[in-house]
Design a protein with these regions (language model features):
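Active-site-proximal helix-loop-helix substrate-binding element of RNase H-like nuclease domains
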Residues: 1-66
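A glycine-rich phosphate-binding loop feature that marks nucleotide/adenosyl-phosphate handling sites
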Residues: 84-96, 128, 174-179, 250-254, ...
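Catalytic palm subdomain of template-directed nucleic-acid polymerases
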Residues: 346-377
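Catalytic nucleotidyl-transfer cores of nucleotide-processing enzymes
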Residues: 1-5, 123-294, 403, 414-445
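Active-site palm subdomain of RNA-directed nucleic acid polymerases
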Residues: 40, 312-343, 355
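C-terminal, non-catalytic extensions of nucleic-acid polymerases
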Residues: 375-620
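Hydrophobic alpha-helical scaffolding
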Residues: 18-22, 59-62, 96-97, 144-148, ...
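Common nucleic-acid-contacting/processivity interface regions adjacent to the catalytic cores
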Residues: 46-173, 256-318, 340, 349-351, ...
Length: 620
């Protein structure tokens, strides 16, 4: 340890702050290519061998690693972000990566401004888990004319609206026949008549969360004040970034390359810092449920999530109410418009308005003014009535719950909870034409990067054209290209935990009971490295490594079904084990595309199978 020197792991920072558009894994080579288009020096062996055999390349290898980190931070600004969080939370640079130290320090500053002091005592562990956010099962299938309405920072807004803070908590309410029991924070229990309870609520200016907890609103709490300040700063930073992005888009043709680069860096900086504010805002709920947070409180955590569930459910109800009141549609038609909901948002289809009322989404290839106007009317209706509802139901004196139009999409497909693909034409007011992938296999780190474009081509054709013959053509083309790819481009990718624990229970090539597939493949790799006396040539797997593994053709000399490797498939394995490309294609490409075909009731056949023509295909 060198006093005054902080050690920051850029991998940890990248994992923490990279929220959207993530690469398939967090290796420096992958991240460098993904973010700045530069790779590490290509070398497959151990660094020790490289240093002995080729010192000059060894030096270049290390210099390139340093260069990559410098260029990455020039773009991402994560070190500045850590410095900002460190100052905001009165903690060391290495501590600023964690939520608890930053919020402790930031709230302590806010408390001191009011001549208050925060607790430093740890609370007892809660039995069981706090309730989480509710996610609605979506209407599975192809959808058109979709608009999403998203709550502005729902959980922080709930804390501000109900003045939720440790020092404002009064107790918990429980019904007792016609009376009301209050379990007060002092430890005492009071029983009040309904009339006395109403009087008590008025005197305390108390809000009532969905979990039944009371919070006084006589004075603004530390947490709501802290969140209010963060929310304002994030909004300002986000608006600044949008202004710079709009200016760049409008003037790109007349700006110099130097000016464009500076604007792009400024836009990235704005995005990084608004995301930092967002992380702090959204971390407050997690902080409240954290056993090691001095100000943590499970009653507050439950109050936030259960109130959030109720509010997002009301958002859906108000949309249905608006559609029925304005257009006189039936309950069944209104229900069909409600596509799905995440924790803080709802997805609705307005296609029925195009069918029955001539409200077209598109006009000259762009979202029509009439469609925007209708979205604004829906948003206004939801916000007016949800504010009234929050004030009435939760006794809020300062409702901050606001739903805004997030995305306008002409088409998309929903599979299951939190898994969908949408073709977005408007993203928070910015006119775009892009696909938004959420939760599906093709955007996870478990799928090889080279394979993803083949699958996306099929999915995007299905969404925009819904042409089965064309989609099948793309799928068959993907199969032909897949067969020509090297092994490292068609492998499964997985993380690995508890590897040593499972490995100890293995006996030769007899695997431990319930050992995960990726761990089996990694164990077999290590076994074969020893068996073939390749210890100095290829590193062995250990817990925490990213595992690439493939299915093998059977039978083979060792009877193995799968085997793992690091970056490149060892040539020594080639002589013993043949990779089963058919099975790899089935598990990676076929399985992914099949889920989308199933969603629209299409049948997907494997390209290598000779199957009879089904009646539905003959008649279609």
């Amino acid at each position: 340890v060198i006093e005054g020197i902080s050690c920051l792991d850029y991998l940890v920072m990248y994992t923490k702050f990279k929220i959207f558009n993530k690469p398939e894994d967090n290796k420096l080579d992958t991240v460098g290519e993904h973010e700045i288009g530069i790779n590490k020096v290509d070398y497959d062996g151990t660094l020790w061998d490289l240093s002995v055999k080729d010192w000059e390349t060894y030096v270049d290898y290390n210099l390139r690693d340093v260069e990559l980190l410098v260029l990455l931070d020039e773009k991402l600004q994560y070190i500045n972000l850590i410095r900002f969080l460190s100052h905001a939370g009165l903690c060391g640079l290495s501590q600023a990566i964690d939520t608890v130290p930053v919020i402790n320090g930031a709230v302590a500053i806010k408390a001191r401004q009011h001549n208050k002091y925060i607790s430093t005592f740890f609370r007892p562990a809660r039995i069981g888990k706090n309730p989480g956010g509710a996610v609605q099962d979506p209407k599975v299938g192809h959808v058109r004319n979709v608009v999403s309405f998203d709550a502005n920072s729902l959980y922080p807004s709930i804390m501000i609206s109900l003045n939720i803070s440790p020092e404002t908590k009064l107790g918990k309410v429980e019904r007792n026949g016609d009376d009301v029991n209050i379990q007060h924070v002092s430890g005492r229990t009071f029983t009040l008549t309904k009339e006395a309870f109403v009087k008590y609520m008025k005197e305390e200016k108390a809000s009532l969360s969905k979990s039944g907890h009371l919070f006084t609103q006589k004075e603004k709490g530390l947490m709501p004040e802290f969140l209010d300040n963060l929310y304002t700063k994030r909004k300002d930073m986000k608006n600044l970034g949008k202004e710079k992005e709009a200016f760049l888009n409008q003037n790109k043709s007349i700006l110099s390359q130097e000016e464009i680069k500076k604007l792009e860096v400024d836009i990235q900086k704005c995005d990084t810092f608004q995301n930092a504010y967002k992380i702090c805002l959204n971390s407050m709920y997690g902080y409240m449920g954290n056993l090691y947070a001095p100000l943590g409180d499970d009653d507050i955590a439950a109050s936030i999530t259960l109130t959030g569930q109720a509010i997002n459910g009301k958002n859906r109800d108000l949309f249905v109410e608006y559609m029925q009141n304005t257009y006189g549609i039936s309950d069944q038609e209104a229900e069909a418009c409600c596509i799905g909901a995440d924790t803080d948002s709802g997805y609705f289809s307005l296609y029925i308005l195009e069918e029955k009322h001539g409200l077209n989404l598109l006009e000259d290839g762009m979202v029509s003014d009439r469609f925007y106007e209708e979205c604004d009317k829906i948003s206004e209706y939801i916000n007016t009535h949800i504010s009234e509802w929050v004030i009435k139901n939760f006794r809020s004196l300062d409702s901050r719950i606001v739903y805004k139009r997030e995305s306008v999409c002409d088409a998309g497909i929903f599979l299951v909870k939190k898994q969908y693909v949408l073709h977005v034409l408007d993203d928070e007011g910015l006119k775009v034409k892009k696909f938004k992938y959420k939760g599906v296999a093709v955007v996870t780190g478990k799928m090889p990067k080279v394979v993803k474009p083949y699958i996306k081509t099929v999915i995007e054709c299905l969404i925009l054209e819904k042409d089965r013959d064309k989609c099948n053509g793309y799928f068959n083309d993907a199969y032909e290209k897949f067969k020509e790819l090297p092994h490292h481009n068609i492998c499964h990718i997985s993380g690995m935990n508890n590897f040593e624990e499972y490995s100890k229970k293995c006996d030769g090539l007899k695997m431990a009971n319930k050992m995960p597939v990726a761990l089996k493949a990694a164990y077999r790799h290590n076994y074969m490295i020893r068996e073939l006396k390749l210890d100095g040539k290829y590193p062995k797997f250990k817990t925490g490594d990213k595992v690439r593994y493939v299915n093998l053709k059977t039978p083979n000399r060792y009877g193995l079904e799968t085997i793992a490797f690091h970056d490149k498939y060892p040539k020594e394995f080639e002589e013993i084990f043949q990779v089963d490309y058919e099975k790899q294609f089935d598990k990676i490409v076929f399985a992914s595309v099949k889920s989308f075909y199933n969603a629209v009731n299409w049948t997907l056949r494997k390209p290598n199978e000779n199957v009879r023509i089904e009646l539905e295909d003959f008649l279609s």
